[in-house]
Amino acid sequence: MTRHTVLFIKWQHQLRNLLSLLKKNWFDYTYLMKSIAPLFVTQLYVSNLSSVGELDISELEVSCRSIAEDDLAGQQWCENNGYSGYTSYASLSDLTWRFPIFTELKDILDSHVANFVEKLDFDLDDRDIVLEDMWINILDEGGSHGSHIHPHSVISGTAYVSIPNEAGEIRFEDPRLQFMMSAPPRKKDARTELRTFHSHHPVAGEVLLWESWLRHEVRQNGSKGKRVSISFNYKWSD
């Protein structure tokens, strides 16, 4: 074997190693370039109330309807503000004192909120997320609740008590919507995490939780039955 042959074989071996290295690095580079990471994720917690403790939904519904019949101030507020149905939002702040079932509901909600908060990785500085208020909503046929947020709270949500067929769904809005001035609309079959709006059809016995800054609305109740739910806010304790 001549000296030139030896050098050629050595050069060929080095070239093979170089090509292998380039191929590996190029794969790593193209892999990184193709990676898409979900950032600034909006979390929606959906669970059954009974998954953390027993609760008599039938008793809760009877209590809601009984309070609605007796709360004259709440009825007047609904009439003055064009609310189609009944809400205790502006009239009662002591539901847990009126019927024991609301105290049971609070204990169950506390557990669900604790589960949700743990997943959100909040730095609470040794303070707690505690119930701030809860209120009854009873929407009549044709009733709805316009788009809104819950300012000054951390976690908001709704427990669903009685949801007839064709009752209004709850719809959430992408919180970045006001910044999408030049963005084209999403496809109708876009993935859930990419949609501008997300609608959820609740069922009785279900609880939904979200961060209070998330804009949402209740769509029109298309059923002749009443849509009964209990909404609530949790705050960061002092």
Segments from the language model and where they lie:
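Catalytic core of Fe(II)/2-oxoglutarate
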Residues: 189-238
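Active-site region of the double-stranded beta-helix
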Residues: 94, 100-130, 140-154, 161-165
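Hydrophobic residues positioned within well-ordered beta-strands of beta-sheet architectures
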Residues: 45, 132-134, 155-157, 228-232
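Catalytic core of non-heme Fe(II) oxygenases with the double-stranded beta-helix
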Residues: 136-209
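N-terminal amphipathic/basic-hydrophobic helices that include classical n-h-c signal peptides
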Residues: 1-32
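Short N-terminal helix-initiation segments at or just after the protein's N-terminus
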Residues: 75-82, 94-106, 152, 171-180, ...
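Solvent-exposed residues in well-ordered beta-strands and their adjoining turns
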Residues: 50, 139, 160-162, 233-237
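Non-heme Fe(II)/2-oxoglutarate
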Residues: 26-123
